[in-house]
């Protein structure tokens, strides 16, 4: 899962939106560094990552990537899952429009930015102002995101080419997401993540 799904699952579980978004920027044990509710959000994010990576349907999704891109397929899929969530938001979350949800999330996160790592602050400077999470619904934006990640991290250069697998296998990947994500939503609502 990427930013949007982590925020959505956190909201369903009444977990810290800040903690769930911040987690990828925190190494090691966060206790003592952040308030307990943010630590709980960081830990939820980590559980979601482990759970997602071990789902049989996600493992199946990785098989759609050729050997050249299989190493980066978990990252590509995390971004793609956010695309499908944004694209199907109205179907999956009929009681709250995506822009309204994002406005709420932003209001929960921005006041705390001064107390977060500089890299997280930099991300937030673009995430909200450029409407990244809404733009995840646009497939060309997903290609741009993967290209940007590849440009920033040479070891992940294969991310740019991994978009080809998305184009080639879009429908079966979408079907997999629409099968497993509602189950994750239920688990979050029942605090089973």
Swiss-Prot record:
Keyword annotations: Fatty acid biosynthesis, Fatty acid metabolism, Hydrolase, Lipid biosynthesis, Lipid metabolism
Gene behind the chain: acpH
Transmembrane segments: none
Protein name: Acyl carrier protein phosphodiesterase
Function: Converts holo-ACP to apo-ACP by hydrolytic cleavage of the phosphopantetheine prosthetic group from ACP.
Domain of life: Bacteria
Catalysed reactions listed for this entry: holo-[ACP] + H2O = apo-[ACP] + (R)-4'-phosphopantetheine + H(+)
GO BP annotations listed: fatty acid biosynthetic process
Similarity annotation: Belongs to the AcpH family.
Gene Ontology terms for molecular function: [acyl-carrier-protein] phosphodiesterase activity
This protein's record includes keyword Lipid metabolism: yes
HAMAP family given in the database record: AcpH
The keyword Electron transport appears for this protein: no
EC number: 3.1.4.14
């Amino acid at each position: 899962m990427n930013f949007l799904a982590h925020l959505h699952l956190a909201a369903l579980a009444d977990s810290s939106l800040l903690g769930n978004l911040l987690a990828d920027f925190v190494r090691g044990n966060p206790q003592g560094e952040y308030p307990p509710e943010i630590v709980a959000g960081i830990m939820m994010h980590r559980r979601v990552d482990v759970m997602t990576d071990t789902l049989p349907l996600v493992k199946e999704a990785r098989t759609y990537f050729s050997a050249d891109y299989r190493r980066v397929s978990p990252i590509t899929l995390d971004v793609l899952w956010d695309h499908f969530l944004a694209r199907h938001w109205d179907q999956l979350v009929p009681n709250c429009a995506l822009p309204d949800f994002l406005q709420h999330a932003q209001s929960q996160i921005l006041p705390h930015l001064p107390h977060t790592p500089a890299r997280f602050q930099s991300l937030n400077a673009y995430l909200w102002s450029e409407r990244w999470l809404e733009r995840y619904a646009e497939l060309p934006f997903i290609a741009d995101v993967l290209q940007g990640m590849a440009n920033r991290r040479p070891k992940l250069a294969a991310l740019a080419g991994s978009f080809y697998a998305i184009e080639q296998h879009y429908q079966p990947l979408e079907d997999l997401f629409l099968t497993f994500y509602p189950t994750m939503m239920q688990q979050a609502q029942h605090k089973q993540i």
